[in-house]
């Protein structure tokens, strides 16, 4: 039973990390539309650290 729970948790973790990456790129796209191009490199570096 514990092995099943571990694999389930691992699967959910993979889905969560995938969703996080998707949300991050989506947010960056929105930020690019809102903010001027001069601040883009700063924003990109900031989100890479997250």
From Swiss-Prot:
Task: Provide the alphabetized UniProt keywords.
Answer: Early protein
Could you tell me what induces this protein? Expressed in the early phase of the viral replicative cycle.
Task: State the name under which the record lists this protein.
Answer: Uncharacterized protein pNG2
Instruction: Record the organism.
Output: African swine fever virus (strain Badajoz 1971 Vero-adapted) (Ba71V)
Organism classification, top ranks?
Viruses, Varidnaviria, Bamfordvirae, Nucleocytoviricota, Pokkesviricetes
Q: Which gene encodes it?
A: pNG2
């Amino acid at each position: 039973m514990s092995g099943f729970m571990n694999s389930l948790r691992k699967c959910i973790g993979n889905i969560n990390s995938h969703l996080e990456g998707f949300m991050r790129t989506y947010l960056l796209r929105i930020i690019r539309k809102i903010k001027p191009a001069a601040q883009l490199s700063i924003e990109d570096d900031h989100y890479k650290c997250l």
